Amino acid sequence: MTDTPKPPRKKPQRPAKPAAPREKATLHPRNRHQGHYDFPKLIKSSPELAAFVILNPYGKESIDFANPQAVRVFNRALLKAFYGIAHWDIPADYLCPPIPGRADYLHFLADVLAEDHEGVIPRGASVKALDIGTGANCIYPLLGHSDYGWQFVGSDIDSTAVAAATAIVKANGLHKAISVRLQGNRKQILLGLCDSNERFDVSLCNPPFHASLDEAQRGSQRKWRALGKADPKRKLPVLNFGGQSQELWCEGGEIGFVTQLIQESARLPGLVVWFSTLVSKASNLPPIQSALKKAGALEVKVVEMGQGQKQSRFVAWTFLDKAQRTPG
């Protein structure tokens, strides 16, 4: 009788890697910018856009996103058609933001607030939001007020940006809903910005994510080359979609800025119910989460977002317990 041969020994299995998403990440369900843009509709609302519409390599109408003027006019058309913002312009060389991604941040933040309101998104003028680094474009207050009726205070360390944002607010008759103020101390973010009796339901921030001007320029050149790769001889601007130095970089980069924001929020724990900030790289999350733990945040949320091939996220934190956050 022969012994049955033993099966070969199996090698230990390595943990499976997470499966890559099969489809492009999609916008938030409430985002107004689903699917392809309706350029005939946009041009009807904003005729100046017609001069900038091109056919992309797939034969679809688009604009040249490597042309700052085209992006500016496109944004103006989107704001008018989707949000009722009739007047919007920013000084040359200031950041011209992609509107769908900015809107996504607001919609996901609204969901965070809804969790403390029995699943109902709080709307109207009773909701106060603080936009840290609102910029000349004032984009978050404009979108947030249009979509949810929230009241906004925007802040910035750049007096030119404050003046431009204020002009946009006044031109659209929104001065009762949106105000913009200067943070006079460039080394502070929250400290010295608000009165002792001011309270906000939520704060938001798109932090500068480079640690130096050189790093910002290298990052922008990579983006420009991706956008302009069809024409390698094309002369590329230095900074992608505009942007003043304080909009793009600061000492310590994104981690340094967000860590300071967390430290200052811990000194003003009752100023905002839910503080939040965008985080450009997932690799920056561990030191940020460590800073939040050290600061004594009671609850921290990391919310992932996706627009097409781009993944982004924000971190939200609070120093208030559920009872303190729940109205009534």
Swiss-Prot record:
Transmembrane intervals: none
Record-level GO BP terms:
rRNA base methylation
Identify which top EC class this enzyme belongs to: transferase
The keyword Isomerase appears for this protein = no
According to UniProt, the reaction catalysed is: adenosine(1618) in 23S rRNA + S-adenosyl-L-methionine = N(6)-methyladenosine(1618) in 23S rRNA + S-adenosyl-L-homocysteine + H(+)
UniProt-listed CDD domains:
AdoMet_MTases
Which InterPro entries would you find in this protein's record? METTL16/RlmF, rRNA_lsu_MeTfrase_F, SAM-dependent_MTases_sf
For this protein, the Enzyme Commission number is 2.1.1.181
Q: Where is this region: Disordered?
A: 1-38
Q: Name one GO cellular component term.
A: cytoplasm
* Entry keyword set: Cytoplasm, Methyltransferase, rRNA processing, S-adenosyl-L-methionine, Transferase
Q: Which domain of life is it from?
A: Bacteria
Keyword check for Repressor: no
Tell me where in or outside the cell this protein is found.
Answer: Cytoplasm
The Gene Ontology terms for molecular function here are: 23S rRNA (adenine(1618)-N(6))-methyltransferase activity
Q: What is its main location?
A: cytoplasm
What functional role does this protein have? Specifically methylates the adenine in position 1618 of 23S rRNA.
Family of this protein: Belongs to the methyltransferase superfamily. METTL16/RlmF family.
Q: In its UniProt entry, what is this protein called?
A: Ribosomal RNA large subunit methyltransferase F
Species annotation: Pseudomonas syringae pv. tomato (strain ATCC BAA-871 / DC3000)
Gene of this entry: rlmF
